[in-house]
């Protein structure tokens, strides 16, 4: 599964991580590819290494959504 992160913080608080095919992903100019991972939690480890405030999308990554 390919993951992307929103380079703009959502609500000024979180950089949301999404599956590439998520209907709620940001527009292409605000996407940064994180890479391909087998599990959401592994993608979040990488996302948090880039953006400490990274959070999972409540729609495509509900187990990683905490904000």
Which residues make up each language-model segment?
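Short, mixed-charge low-complexity intrinsically disordered segments
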Residues: 32-67
